[in-house]
């Protein structure tokens, strides 16, 4: 995920939207792992990218939670 996309997620997305995005990425990760197990995966680096994106979005969610708690 590019820095610009992350910035847009930080500023313009609600926590519900971010949760939906995490769920979509988790289902994609499941499918990628299934393809890996069956030998059909074309781009193994995609697994790493998806895991990193999930972590980045979860970090944004946590930042929003802490910001809301402080106020």
Swiss-Prot record:
Family note: Belongs to the universal ribosomal protein uL29 family.
PANTHER family tied to this protein: 60S RIBOSOMAL PROTEIN L35/50S RIBOSOMAL PROTEIN L29 (PTHR10916), LARGE RIBOSOMAL SUBUNIT PROTEIN UL29C (PTHR10916:SF0)
Record keyword Ribosomal protein present: yes
NCBIfam families: L29 (TIGR00012)
Any one biological process term the GO annotation gives: translation
Descriptive protein name: Large ribosomal subunit protein uL29
Ranges in a coiled coil: none
A molecular-function term among this protein's GO annotations: structural constituent of ribosome
Keywords, alphabetical: Ribonucleoprotein, Ribosomal protein
Annotated source species: Clostridium kluyveri (strain ATCC 8527 / DSM 555 / NBRC 12016 / NCIMB 10680 / K1)
Listed InterPro entries: Ribosomal_protein_uL29, Ribosomal_uL29, Ribosomal_uL29_CS, Ribosomal_uL29_sf
Highest taxon, organism lineage: Bacteria
Keyword ATP-binding in annotation: no
Lineage: Bacteria, Bacillati, Bacillota, Clostridia, Eubacteriales
Gene Ontology CC terms, in alphabetical order: cytosolic large ribosomal subunit
Disulfide bonding pattern of the chain: none
Region (Disordered): 1-20
Pfam families: Ribosomal_L29 (PF00831)
């Amino acid at each position: 995920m590019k820095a610009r996309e992350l910035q847009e997620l930080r500023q313009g997305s609600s926590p519900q939207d971010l949760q939906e995005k995490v769920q979509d990425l988790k289902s994609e990760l499941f499918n990628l792992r299934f393809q890996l197990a069956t030998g059909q995966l074309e781009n193994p680096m995609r697994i790493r990218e998806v895991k990193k994106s999930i972590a980045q979005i979860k970090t944004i969610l946590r930042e929003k939670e802490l910001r809301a708690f402080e106020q």
